[in-house]
Amino acid sequence: MKTLTLAHHGLGRRAHAFYVLTKPRVNALIVFCAVIGMFLAVPDGLPDPLRVFAATVGIACVAGAAAAMNCLIEQQLDARMARTRNRPLPRGELHSVEVLVFAGVLGGFGLSVLYQAVNALTMWLTLATFVGYAVIYTLLLKPRTPQNIVIGGASGAMPPVLGWAAVSGEVTAEALLLFLIIFAWTPPHFWSLALYRTADYARAGLPMLPVTHGAAYTRLSVLLYTCALFGVTLLPFAIRMSGWIYLVAAVTLGLRFVHYAWRLLRDYSDALARRTFRFSIVYLSLLFAALLADHYLRL
């Protein structure tokens, strides 16, 4: 009985380790934005629930596979950083081959679901997003250029486009505008994190902006990109994609984000950078929730 209990406990720990590899909190935001895209793609009424379910499962699986590949590729870097040294691979809880197989099976399953139950366009776009994050960003951009977040942000901005394509079978200007919002949001979001983790990134040898250009330059960049983001978020109202509910939310949230960025520039502290980073996640979630609310409660 004791042996069975220990075996069950060990199996549970390994299952949890694989779960952690998928970066579930990041994945949740990805899926959330994708699902919002699915609902916004339908002018009137609701999208087909089975298609929404299949697309959600497929996108979540491929996103989890991309996260696992990122952990696999960066395991030596993760071991040198306080923020990531407790991930399963640096701790020795899993082997590289296991993670590679896990990512392949999970990603292959997700792509198969998208192709069979959604449409080919969504499958190909999701595959391109996987390659963009796991290969282009992780292998080529992140270790080589301080603009890694800016360029690599394209893959992270894809979820609403994937959701839109899943339901409509096409990529429209409105879908690309959702892409643009997340693309503009990505630099201030990640640079806020990099500001209070500068020593970590320097220790790992990663050329994040605060490491290569200094904290002052990065804080100014956060402010400039946040102001640009504010302007971009007004476009859905300007093109009549969204109405007053969204506009009020976008202005309120945007001014708050700009206020955080301004304070970072003028009165920096690690605690403030951490709060800014956390607020940026809340900001994006509420902004997309406002898009959805406005879609069905248009004023």
Swiss-Prot record:
Localization recorded for this chain is: Cell inner membrane
For this protein, the record's CDD domains field holds: PT_UbiA_Cox10
Q: Does the keyword tRNA-binding apply?
A: no
The reactions it catalyses are: heme b + (2E,6E)-farnesyl diphosphate + H2O = Fe(II)-heme o + diphosphate
EC number of this enzyme: 2.5.1.141
**UniProtKB keywords:** Cell inner membrane, Cell membrane, Heme biosynthesis, Membrane, Transferase, Transmembrane, Transmembrane helix
Membrane topology listed for this record = Multi-pass membrane protein
Q: State the pathway, as annotated in the record.
A: Porphyrin-containing compound metabolism; heme O biosynthesis; heme O from protoheme: step 1/1
Enzyme group, top EC level?
transferase
Any single GO CC term annotated in Swiss-Prot or TrEMBL for this entry: plasma membrane
Biological process (GO) annotations held by this record are: heme O biosynthetic process
Any stretches that span the bilayer, and where are they? 26-46, 53-73, 94-114, 121-141, 149-169, 175-195, 217-239, 243-265, 277-297
GO MF, one annotated term: protoheme IX farnesyltransferase activity
The protein's superkingdom reads Bacteria
> What is this protein for, i.e. what is its function?
Converts heme B (protoheme IX) to heme O by substitution of the vinyl group on carbon 2 of heme B porphyrin ring with a hydroxyethyl farnesyl side group.
Cross-referenced PANTHER family, in alphabetical order? 4-HYDROXYBENZOATE SOLANESYLTRANSFERASE, PROTOHEME IX FARNESYLTRANSFERASE, MITOCHONDRIAL
Into which family does the record put it? Belongs to the UbiA prenyltransferase family. Protoheme IX farnesyltransferase subfamily.
Q: What else is known?
A: Carbon 2 of the heme B porphyrin ring is defined according to the Fischer nomenclature.
Name of the protein in question: Protoheme IX farnesyltransferase
Point out the gene that encodes the protein. Answer: ctaB
